[in-house]
């Protein structure tokens, strides 16, 4: 071995020594070694020092239980007491983080106190006071709601409100479209817009921030396309963006203009998890984006589609990057599922009445409403009618139990739909509410792979083979030669040298190493993962175990993924009707509406 290579290996070993020491501590505590690697990724090379100073920082990592952090603390600091103030303070943040997993940015003092008592914190009030003093937690006392919030989310919601007011105050009128000579219908003008759609266009051109909402088939896309055209006629530059790659691609096709993911628009870049002194850096919600207050977006008008998917931190980063005078048009269906991350930005903007909102309700798609559009509109309004679809645009397939549900799904995708309707399996997407069980994503993907793309033994690498359909579960815009975004569905084209090449539609992405953990098989995906995308044909499977998870927004989101054909494999009994009739989705507690004033 040459001296140069030996020197590099020695340097690499010395640099990795803190990670080895941390892994040893994890094993001593009875925790998996991989948790040490995750800690180093999250906290940086000083992770061991940080965690020895405060072992309960470990709770900042997703999936870490209180018992895990306690075990690590005993290994890191022999003789440490359960009454340690660092533990009590960390548990306040942990309680609020657990609430954030359910979408809440605000939690009652009573709930946090209950969580602390459950984990044997003797003085919850003092623990809360300590967490607030450390500026990790904020106490919120508002007109709409009161409670505790993680500082990062409170600051994000406050920043959204400030930016909305800033854009509202600095906007100048781009232009205005007027009604042309009415056609005989006395409803639609020569641009193809009805009066309500036209008012949405004028809102976008007149106001700094405006909202357009409505269900499928109501003309949101036509309205947005008109906004883009009118802005460009006025000599203004336009940016089109959406939370997912598929949604951005569809927006580009509808508007005949370039569109991209919000992350790509903002210029995503690696995020530093901690500062040099070990204090958390996550309070800067726009960290990781090149665009921001110092280098704002150049466009005069920014249009964001599928805005129900915006969580508070992404929305805050987007609004922060909008320069004074920018017009921001926010488009989305308020009846869809809220964001995976905390908050309900679209719903709060609508409820606040701080910005002009237009809701489209008239059905235009498919000659005033095909079976898919009619069903979606009914569900949006809380009704579940009998399906009337002689052309088999919507088909209900009853099933008894999860195993039969799974069998029906495989049969529909591999045989019935291609044979009866001429829609190839490559255009069909399975959507399910669950991961586990016979009708969950894991089992369905295994069954569909066995039928559609059984592994060739000489080309396999890990789980993936050429021809596999896959879905991205995280953003990796740094991938080469083409990056990809969370939610993008692609096809594996090559497997070689422990690297999987995937075509996501915008170009090939070479995926290897730790990045592979963020790729899953994609013949069957969850409702949340499907949000923001549309497919030629969709099979929605509703197994019995999904009953308690169903809500009107979840059902509505699932049904509206289909463009040409929708098959519903129904095994959930009366739970579906119950979910549709009762909104069923527990309201998220947020403070944005109050900040908007």
Functional labels for PLM-detected ranges:
Residues 106, 210-390:
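ASCE P-loop NTPase helicase motor core
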Residues 474, 488-597:
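C-terminal accessory regions
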Residues 2, 65, 112, 160, ...:
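Residue-level signature of catalytic and energy-coupling elements of molecular machines
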Residues 1-176, 180-181, 205:
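Accessory, non-ATPase domains that flank or precede helicase/AAA+ motor cores in DNA-metabolism machines
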Residues 190-206:
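N-terminal pre-P-loop "Q-motif" helix
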Residues 182, 186, 199, 334-485, ...:
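Conserved helicase motor core of P-loop NTPases
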Residues 65, 205-207, 234, 296-298, ...:
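Short loop/turn elements that form and flank the Walker-type P-loop nucleotide-binding site
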